[in-house]
Amino acid sequence: MSRRAYAEMYGPTTGDRIRLADTELLIEVERDYTIYGEEVKFGGGKVIRDGMGQSQLSAADVADTVITNAVILDHWGIVKADIAIKHGRIAAIGKAGNPDIQPGVTIAIGAATEIIAGEGLIVTAGGIDTHIHFISPQQIDEALASGVTTMIGGGTGPATGTNATTCTPGPWHMERMLQAADGWPINLGFLGKGNASRPQPLVEQIEAGAIGLKLHEDWGTTPAAIDNCLTVADDTDTQVAIHTDTLNEGGFVEATVAAFKGRTIHTYHTEGAGGGHAPDILKVCGEPNVLPSSTNPTRPYTINTLDEHLDMLMVCHHLDPSIAEDLAFAESRIRRETIAAEDILHDLGALSMLSSDSQAMGRVGEVIIRTWQSAHKMKMQRGALAEDSARNDNFRAKRYVAKYTINPALTHGIAHEVGSIEPGKWADLVLWEPAFFGVKPAMIIKGGMIAVAQMGDPNASIPTPQPVHYREMFATRGGALARTSLTFVSQLTLDAGIGARYGLAKRLVPVRGCRTVTKRDMIHNAWQPAISVDPETYDVVADGALLTCEPAAVLPMAQRYFLF
């Protein structure tokens, strides 16, 4: 059987290479967990039939769902395997079938097992977006359809504060937002407002349900507020996210780093145009306690990036273009040199995460697509990474997928539940046809159940006739919704019994390990260079090397995918 014929029947195997969408990125299957000649496949005349690939075992001893012959792309590897789901969690990665008659079976299929055909598909962990302004609930539909299954941030709707900052302020708003979370088929966590110089206003927000706290310059990110917020976080094992002081009113970047006192913090907008200390916020990438992320409007740097940012910034931060000081504030944040350096710092693993900044200078449905566009641009401009071979871009792919999966999960203390495809974790999985990888998922699974899929006319005789578009599936309806998605809170919240007090239906899961994670723990993205930014030219130098690149004029994963 030729390799081509085998791949068409059972999907790629060890040594086969797959192009990601229309990029120049190639991944190569490193290992095949299935056994040649013993593969399982569902369909008429196929293997998964009673007495053949399907065993006589009862429900307790078989998988609830098996994704057959899928290529897994995750931070830990690129492998071909069957994936078992049981009770909403990933149960195993291995070889599925009937252990009574087949060798090497690690996943039993029975009458209680549903099958999802993964032949020819790539499976990734559900994306995690940790920079959400909850301005409109419709963002969740867009995010979920793009492959994001967990959203962390703050807000209360299109309030002026939420339009600019990712904070859900105070116990009353926190209770209302947690109640609203019960209505959406996605994992959610809310950040309280961290801008206060005394502990009690912050502690009460964490008790009320906050997953962590957010410091934002628009509320006054002073050294005193930073110190107080991190002290409360240390006491409650929660994470702090920070948008630093663009105007350098409360101090320069050195004063902010000093206020951290070596404590762990997630720095939003560690990048070219999102805000923070101008012009040298990128310096914090070299700090061992700083977990840096950037947002997707500047990803990747293109010929259009600068032009779109000024108006975007004026709207999001409630600025008036007729006021000279407001205009100067906006222009200080948009620097081509630091945006270009951001591309390279992502490629070298100094910037550990990528998120959206939804409707507040960011596009909630484009975290994944812009991650892979950035990876493509860097390959075209900088060539293969030292860790990669001439045959594939496996390391680069692992580095970039980690930016929106495992590293955000580690940062916010939820990696014990989500962020990777590993046994025991919540079964949030995204299935992709390789030609549409990163652009349009084929199916999104939440908590082991199909939540969103590309579906044709519901009145048609088969599932595929036009119009085919994303439609919500049964995991988004009735009681299944609350049993297939999670709400993340602090242990303090859980101890306070807010689930019963608020009348919440979703399972509440406490975050953990938020205060011990460091830059060293950022998988494939742990580089800590010494960075300097010239205050006059904005040139960025990392470990003695000037970081600069040209803007892209053309990108993959773009117009050819969105003609209709």
Curated annotation (Swiss-Prot):
One of its GO terms (biological process) is urea catabolic process. Ni(2+) 1 binds at H131, H133, K214, D357. One of its GO terms (molecular function) is nickel cation binding. Transmembrane segments: none annotated. Coiled coil: none annotated. Heterotrimer of UreA (gamma), UreB (beta) and UreC (alpha) subunits. Three heterotrimers associate to form the active enzyme. It catalyses: urea + 2 H2O + H(+) = hydrogencarbonate + 2 NH4(+). The modification N6-carboxylysine is found at K214. This is Urease subunit alpha.
